[in-house]
């Protein structure tokens, strides 16, 4: 599991290679990843936007930006957590992802929190992110 904490908001990520959705001969590899966001702070916050940087084993980088996550802009009161699962395809057998979420307090203050860099590994291309 990968973990980052910014302003007492913890983000953990657990990637999972999906061989049933992947094909080495077609150069299509697919992972799911489960993200848990836990608000250990004292303010209620809303997740506004996401920004992902996805890098494959060849060094090609793709950036993904958008509102919310999985169609939601969750609100987390102190002590609450939000969990979701999404997926990512790559044309190589390994890679990594990292990102940021823009959060907003009830007072309207916007700030960014880190999503920890995490490794996307498959049996065909084991690679570890240190």
UniProtKB/Swiss-Prot annotation:
GO BP terms: error-free translesion synthesis
Chain ranges of the ApaG domain: 3-127
Signal peptide: none
SUPFAM superfamilies, per the entry: ApaG-like
Gene3D superfamilies: ApaG domain (2.60.40.1470)
Descriptive protein name: Protein ApaG
Organism encoding this protein: Rhodopseudomonas palustris (strain TIE-1)
């Amino acid at each position: 599991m990968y973990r980052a904490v910014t302003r007492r908001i913890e983000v953990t990520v657990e990637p999972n290679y999906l061989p049933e959705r992947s094909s080495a001969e077609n150069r299509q590899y697919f992972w799911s990843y489960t993200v848990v966001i836990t608000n250990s702070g004292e303010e209620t916050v809303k997740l506004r936007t996401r920004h992902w940087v996805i890098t494959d084993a060849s060094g090609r980088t793709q950036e993904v930006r958008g509102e919310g996550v999985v169609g939601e802009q969750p609100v987390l009161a102190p002590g609450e957590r939000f969990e979701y699962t999404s997926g990512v395809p790559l044309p190589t057998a390994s890679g990594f992802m990292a990102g940021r979420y823009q959060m907003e307090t009830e007072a309207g203050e916007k700030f960014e929190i880190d999503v920890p860099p995490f490794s996307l590994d498959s049996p065909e291309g084991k690679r570890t992110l240190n």
